[in-house]
A protein has these predicted regions:
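The feature captures the beta-strand-to-loop junction immediately N-terminal to the Walker
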Residues: 66-68
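Helix-to-loop junction immediately C-terminal to a conserved catalytic motif
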Residues: 81
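Conserved ABC ATPase "signature" region
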Residues: 128-146
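Hydrophobic anchor residue at the start of the ABC signature
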Residues: 164
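Conserved beta-strand-loop-alpha-helix hinge in the C-terminal portion
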Residues: 232-253
Length: 253
């Protein structure tokens, strides 16, 4: 996904990330976390990015989508969050959603970890409630004690975990992660992947993560995986099975 200006990112985090999409789209057609029903989208230049695309995520978990550049993955994410509107078809989200960008520097806007997380918390909470929520999020993402830490001193993996915490600060329970480990070293990749998987399998309050990847080795951690091609998504299958079918490696950029 292309980078976005900081002013637009701020608006996205405050308004779109915690947006309840149900009233904007359709009544619940299925008991699903996310349901995309025959959605099509054509760009002004005539390119058909999505072509009667359908998918259903039926329960919380880590769900991965693979596909070459131009297959429609990022367009789908923009439609789910409401940055774009379907031209044909419909989308239903049971949970409020938030985007996590490939490059956390495009998402982290303020100097310190704590102040950046404050930006995403609903303003109707007291300052004491907001501070406690910041500490809880930092602890949850393995960033304990870093509320006053300058963001520019963090590693790439720490920045990405802070970006995920920022998405959760808005009370989003559906995370849309657009190649979140693409810029990370192997250790950072493993840490971010394991952190998201733990969030998805939390015994009390699990989240749903919809994760775009070019790294097929990551599929082994998925609860389900699918391939996107020419604006359509294939059936869900197990991550290892899809990885074997695609012979492991990386899609061409």
């Amino acid at each position: 996904m292309r980078s976005l200006p900081s002013s637009f990112t701020r608006k996205l985090r405050r308004q779109v990330a915690a947006n309840d999409r149900v009233s904007q789209l359709i009544p619940d057609p299925v008991n699903a976390e996310l349901h995309v029903d025959s959605v099509s989208y054509q760009w002004p230049n005539g390119h058909h990015s999505l072509n009667r695309c359908s998918l259903t995520i039926s329960k919380p978990g880590l769900w991965m989508l693979v596909g070459s550049n131009g297959s429609g993955k990022s367009t789908l994410f923009r439609l789910v969050t409401g940055l774009l509107q379907p031209q044909v078809g419909s989308i239903y989200c049971q949970r409020s959603s938030a985007l996590v960008f490939q490059n956390p520097d495009h998402q982290l806007l303020l100097p310190s970890c704590g102040s950046d997380l404050m930006l995403g918390i609903r303003p109707n909470q007291s300052m004491d409630q907001r501070r406690k929520k910041v500490e809880a999020l930092l602890n949850q993402l393995g960033l304990h004690g870093l509320a006053k830490r300058p963001i520019h001193t963090l590693s790439g993996g720490q920045k990405q975990r802070l970006a995920i915490a920022g998405a959760l600060a808005s009370d989003a329970r559906l995370l849309l992660l657009d190649e979140p480990t693409a810029l990370l070293d192997p250790q950072g990749q493993r840490t971010v992947l394991n952190t998201v998987r733990e969030l998805c399998h939390d015994p009390v309050k699990p989240i749903t993560a919809f994760w775009i990847t070019h790294r097929l080795d990551e599929l082994s951690q998925a609860d389900g995986a699918a391939q996107m091609s020419m604006g359509r998504i294939g059936p869900w299958t197990s991550g290892p099975e899809l990885g074997q079918r695609l012979q492991f490696g990386r899609f061409s950029k």
